[in-house]
Regions:
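Surface-exposed, interaction-prone regions used to assemble/regulate multi-protein complexes
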Residues: 1-128
């Protein structure tokens, strides 16, 4: 069982918003969305990066089955701090495809980053 229980599953993805530290995944006919956050320990910095030939908007229309950690990889130094750790995460879909992305963390070598997933409600706009 995935440790990321807050992920919305079996609902079509309708929209994606990607920023360095967050990925917002919105779902068709739903008042909920998932917020994926690149978290960091006290003296480090974390952010998401995508693989060059793998645009994230290709997951629109798919249904998420699970999210999992895959492996650590070597990448060119980020130059943010002294040491980098690069975690590959995978979103698995119900059609047996997947999408990989990178959570990068840079620190003095004593700290690391991690992925958090939050389930959020879409705030309705009031029309007055």
């Amino acid at each position: 069982m995935s440790k990321y229980q807050k992920i919305c599953t079996n609902v079509k993805i309708s929209e994606i918003h990607f920023k360095n530290g967050t990925i917002d995944i919105y779902f068709k006919d739903s008042d909920e969305y998932n917020l994926l956050i690149a978290c960091a320990d006290c003296c480090s910095e974390s952010w998401f990066e995508l693989f060059v030939d793998d645009p994230i908007d290709q997951i629109i229309g798919k249904k998420i089955q699970s999210v999992q950690y895959v492996k650590d990889i070597d990448l060119p130094p980020s130059g943010v701090q002294e040491c980098d750790i690069n975690h590959v995460y995978r979103i698995n879909f119900t059609d047996d495809t997947h999408y990989d992305f990178i959570l990068r963390n840079s620190s003095n070598g004593y700290y690391d980053g991690w992925l958090e997933i939050h389930k959020k409600k879409i705030l309705k706009k009031l029309i007055i």
